Amino acid sequence: MNGVMNFKPIYEPRPDDGLRVMLYSHDSVGLGHLRRNLAIAGSITQSFSEASAMIVTGSPCATQFELPASTDLIKIPSISKDSDGQYVTGSFGGSLETTLRFRSRMILETYRAFSPDLIIVDHQPTGLKGEAMATLKEAKANGTKIFFGMRDVVDSPDVVRRDWDNADCHWALNECYDQICVY
């Protein structure tokens, strides 16, 4: 072995318009997920001259950041946490369930309209309370490559086990994702 590793690309850009990447994160608290997705989008569009990126985020601050070249942004309704740590709807109003259904539809319709070669999901394997499941299932059925990205430390092991110990999360981690990236 000569020390050089050869990796086979797991995606092939379309010859007509280059690589298209959709980056999703629920972004209910803080700026870390959005900033990470902005950095990833910038790196992709700089590395591939014909690439384009679409960021889908619930961050209330999303429109205050400069977007990298060839990158656009879909702002879904914000969800935050109350003083008890429970998710609540933002200015969209209505119930949390109604807001999550609306966000889920926006994520799915963005996927359909943008038609990405690759989806990168940040932090929550199925999105906030499963809001990305319909998109993940359709993307998987269509042969879209799907990556999951996460920080090296998410929360305490007990909290992660509690949050991720369900059938949808197991499906996403074991069958849906083509790659899992730890940042």
Locate each region found by the language model:
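Structural motif
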Residues: 20, 117-118, 179
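A short, glycine/small-residue-rich beta-strand->loop->alpha-helix junction that serves as a flexible
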Residues: 25-38, 61-62
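Nucleotide-activated donor-dependent transferases that construct or modify glycoconjugates
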Residues: 10-30
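Conserved nucleotide-sugar donor-binding subdomain of glycosyltransferases
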Residues: 89-128
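Histidine-anchored nucleotide/phosphate-binding helix
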Residues: 34-45, 133-139
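An aromatic- and histidine-rich active-site surface loop
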Residues: 61-63, 120-138
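Active-site-proximal region of nucleotide-activated glycan assembly enzymes
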Residues: 135-183
